[in-house]
């Protein structure tokens, strides 16, 4: 009987301590609400090299915050990582320049980034045309 009472008291104590710890953790996660509404955000600065995880600094009045951000490794540096564009299909190959061109219109500017309304991208013409892949041989009945 004493063992059962001890176990019940121990269980209640453990539950009380864990609920208090969860409450403290939840309150710790909340940051003081800011009355700033006009945040100005800088560009994402990668931690190493020129792409991957990084940080972005924002200011509002006298308050400064840092956010984690990520620069995709396939981004076009001329356009900026915070400018998202909708691109058309690649044009025909220009024989004189040896390049294909396509244009893109601004779809979204993240963090109030200063983006161009339209941009052009170029790439070298491919030397050989791609052929459609054929079905795999040897699979199935003959």
Swiss-Prot record:
Cellular compartments annotated: Secreted
Gene Ontology molecular function terms on file: growth factor activity; heparan sulfate proteoglycan binding; heparin binding
Signal peptide: 1-20
Role this protein plays: Secreted protein that functions as a cytokine and growth factor and mediates its signal through cell-surface proteoglycan and non-proteoglycan receptors. Binds cell-surface proteoglycan receptors via their chondroitin sulfate (CS) groups. Thereby regulates many processes like inflammatory response, cell proliferation, cell adhesion, cell growth, cell survival, tissue regeneration, cell differentiation and cell migration. Inhibits mesoderm formation and promotes neural formation during development. Plays a role in development of the neuromuscular junction (NMJ).
Tissue/organ expression: Expression at the mid-gastrula stage begins in the neural anlage, and becomes increasingly prominent in the central nervous system and head mesenchyme during neurula stages. Although the mRNA is localized to the developing central nervous system (CNS), the protein is deposited at the neuromuscular junction (NMJ). In the tailbud stage embryo, expressed in the head and tail regions as well as in the CNS. In adults, expression is highest in the brain, eye and bone, with lower expression in the heart and lung. Not expressed in the ovary.
Superkingdom in the source lineage: Eukaryota
Protein name as annotated: Midkine-A
Disulfide bonds: 36-60, 44-69, 51-73, 83-115, 93-125
Record keyword Secreted present: yes
Family membership noted in the UniProt record: Belongs to the pleiotrophin family.
Keyword Lipid metabolism: no
Residue ranges crossing the lipid bilayer per the database entry: none
Record GO biological process: defense response to bacterium; nervous system development; neuromuscular junction development; positive regulation of cell division; response to bacterium
Keywords, sorted A to Z: Antibiotic, Antimicrobial, Developmental protein, Disulfide bond, Growth factor, Heparin-binding, Mitogen, Secreted, Signal
Pfam annotation, one family: PTN_MK_N
Cellular component terms (Gene Ontology): extracellular region
Gene name of the encoded protein: mdk-a
PROSITE patterns per UniProt: PTN_MK_1, PTN_MK_2
InterPro entries tied to this protein: Midkine_heparin-bd_GF, PTN/MK_C_dom, PTN/MK_C_dom_sf, PTN/MK_diS_sf, PTN/MK_N_dom, PTN/MK_N_dom_sf, PTN_MK_heparin-bd_GF_CS
Organism whose genome encodes this protein: Xenopus laevis
